[in-house]
Amino acid sequence: MPSHCFLIGSLPLEVIDSPRVWRDKLPANYRPFAVDTTAGPDRAVLTVADRTPWQIPEGEAPLSEVFNDLGVTHLYRHPGGWLVSISPRPGDSPRLMLIDPSFARAELRVAGSDPMGAFVLDSMLRIFFSQYAATRGALLLHASAVELDGNAYLFMGRSGTGKSTHTRLWVNTFPGASIINDDVPLVQSDARGIPTVFGTPWSGKGCVWRRVSAPLRGIARLRQHPADEFIAAEGIDAFIAVLPGISVMTADADLYSRACTTILAFLNCAAVTVGTLLCTPRHSAAILSRSSLAPSDSQ
C-alpha cells in the first residue's frame, strides 16, 4: 500500500494512502517535507481507508463546532478515541476521521474517487498532526511567521486582522526578510531548549511551503488601529495573547494542559518578547514591530 513519509520540525509523519486519494502524485505543499522513511515507532501515522464510515449517533451534539477554511468541523467522543467530522462545503456529507487516545494514530475513511478527497486528507492531516505535536512538546500556531537576521517572529490575530499583510510589510521593508510560513507554523524547542519556528505544509492562501527554521525572537498579536502602537505583555498577559492561536482539542483535558504547559515553556525563554501591536497596514507598523520585538537588532 502507498506510504508517504514526512518530517515536520523534528516530528515524523506517515500517511498510508490505500485508496490513492493523492493519485500517486504528492501534492506540492508536502514535497519539501518528504523523506525516504520515518525511523522508529515514535511517529504520527494516518491511514486512509476506503471503508464504511463510522456512525455519529443520531441526535448527539458535538463537543465543538468550528467554521473556517477547512469547512464545518465537529468533534465527538468515540469508544475508540476522538471522532472528527468535516463537511468541506455547505450541504456536503461529513467525512470522518478517528484519532486514537494516544494521538499518534488516526484513520480517515474516504473513497479514492471522492472529488474532495485530497482536500479532506490535507485538512484532516493538519488537525491530526496538531494534536500529535502537542503530545510532543510542540505546537501548531495560527500565525504568519517571518525570518530576519536569523530570528523568527510570529504575528497572530483573528482571521482578516492582517497577519499576512504585516509579514509582507517586513519583506518589503527589511532587506533579507523572508516568510517561513503564512498560516500554521510549528513551534518546537530545539536540543538546547530554545523555542524554534519551523515551516509546515499548511500555509493557507500564501502557499509558502518551506522546510526552514529559525529561533523564535518575538510574538505580536495584531489589532487593526488608526495609529501604530506596541503594548508589551508579560506573565499571564503574554500567555493570553498566545493561547487563542493553538489548534488543540480543549475537550481532552490532559492534551489541553500539555499545550498550555508548552506555551509557558516558550514564554519563559528570556529571548522571546511578546506584545499586542495596534497597527495600520503601512511600513511604519513594520518598523515599530521590529524595534519593539527586537530592539537590539533594529539599530
Protein language model annotation of sequence segments:
Residues K163:
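Conserved lysine of the Walker
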Residues M1-S159, L169-S178, P185-Q299:
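A noncatalytic interaction/capping subdomain that flanks phosphate/NTP-handling catalytic cores
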Residues H166:
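Hydrophobic positions on the alpha1 helix immediately C-terminal to the Walker A/P-loop
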